Amino acid sequence: MVGESAIGVRGLVKRYGAVEAVRGIDLEVARGEVFALLGPNGAGKTTTVEILEGYRPRTGGEVEVLGVDPGLGGRAWRSRIGIVLQSGETTRELTVRDTLRLWAAYYPAPRAVTDVIDLVGLGEKADARIGRLSGGQRRRVEVGMALIGNPELVFLDEPTTGFDPEARRQFWGVIGGLRDLGTTVFLTTHYMDEAQALADRVAIVKDGQVVAEGPPGELGPGRDQAAVITFVLPDGSQASDLPAGLGGETAVNGRRVTLRSERPTAALGELAVWAARHGGELAQLTVSRPSLEDVYLELTGAP
């Protein structure tokens, strides 16, 4: 079903009694891709991920992960994936190095412990006990435990929850390192800036269904992808003097103009010529597009 894809899902359904938690989800994740699954609490994200990981049976649909039905995946299949849960426990008395050595013993062809320590950025803490690490550093150890088996695919569930901004950005570098290695990453997160910064593609789920899928910068209906141009009218000009061919929607509040345009480059060119003819500059000029967070809030109906 999936061919060269790492994950293929068709018509996935999961019911709990009369409650349908997942309602016909379709997904495809390419090998080597960083893919983010987004959605509010109760949208079906966790159930979907647990089915992909082989921890939960499905009610209906087809699922393949690395070419195997996860419901039938055995030890050999599990050795090809790594999983980082939202919260995990490690033995506080062991060092980082000893922890990874212990986990390496479970796999037939593990990565070198020193390579994994370097990958997760813990070289200076390799011989420190887990109990003496910060929360962000312990999270890196958990990622190292998921990577020590040299997996083709890694699931990261809310990997930076509780991190301070600096620790989050440092952890993003770890994800970048996985991409460089060609490892497929399936990520869930409530941080839209994290998904926008890391993911090649995202899927947004609501009420057990995918409501949007694609690169973070290309989601949402056409109107929501319009650029927003704002500026202050030059002295001596009026909004009624603006070029007629700008297109889009124009709103005027005093001397401030807000223009939504599907062709911002052309609109800016026309505005620049118009401003020059009126002997002024477009003061306080800004051009922006909706962020992934804007699109997410619109699609999920979040307040």
Language-model features: locations:
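ABC transporter nucleotide-binding domain
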Residues: 171-262
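Short, solvent-exposed polar/charged micro-motifs at secondary-structure junctions
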Residues: 125, 240-241, 260-262, 294-298
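Non-catalytic surface loops within mature trypsin-like serine protease
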Residues: 31, 124, 233-235, 263, ...
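C-terminal coupling/interaction segments
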Residues: 2, 264-303
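ABC transporter nucleotide-binding domains
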Residues: 4-9, 14-206, 211-212
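A generic structural signal for secondary-structure junctions
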Residues: 82, 104, 108, 221-225, ...
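Solvent-exposed beta-strand sheet faces enriched in polar/charged residues
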Residues: 10, 232, 251, 286-288
